[in-house]
Amino acid sequence: MVKRTHGYRYKSRKLLSKAPRERGMSGLSRLLYEYKPGDKVVIDIDPTFISTAPHRRYQGKVGVVIGTRGRAYVIETYIGDKKKIIITTPEHLRPHLGG
């Protein structure tokens, strides 16, 4: 038998797809929201923008904005005890409303 591949988007069919009524561009408020260093954000992957999307393991994670790189934001989050740095655009972020 041939070994099955495990690519970057492996096991993400439901996660990285939109329902028919959600297709198309997101609202402008999500794209134009300005984050400042120290703001808490939720990583919420938008499947419309594939090239700037973080890996699916970060979906739903809460992180802290530590800076910018061009239009993108540098986010610090944790996977278990490990600190991870993610660089992604505002399409994949939303403000964290919790405490």
Curated annotation (Swiss-Prot):
Q: Which UniProt keywords apply?
A: Ribonucleoprotein, Ribosomal protein
Q: Which Pfam families match?
A: Ribosomal_L21e
UniProt GO cellular component terms: ribonucleoprotein complex; ribosome
Return the InterPro entries for the record: Ribosomal_eL21, Ribosomal_eL21_arc, Ribosomal_eL21_CS, Ribosomal_eL21_sf, Translation_prot_SH3-like_sf
The alphabetized list of GO BP terms reads: translation
User: Does the keyword field hold Ribonucleoprotein?
Assistant: yes
Q: Which GO terms describe its molecular function?
A: structural constituent of ribosome
This protein's superkingdom? Archaea
| NCBIfam families tied to this protein | PRK04306.1 (NF003303)
Q: Give the UniProt family note.
A: Belongs to the eukaryotic ribosomal protein eL21 family.
Q: What is this protein called?
A: Large ribosomal subunit protein eL21
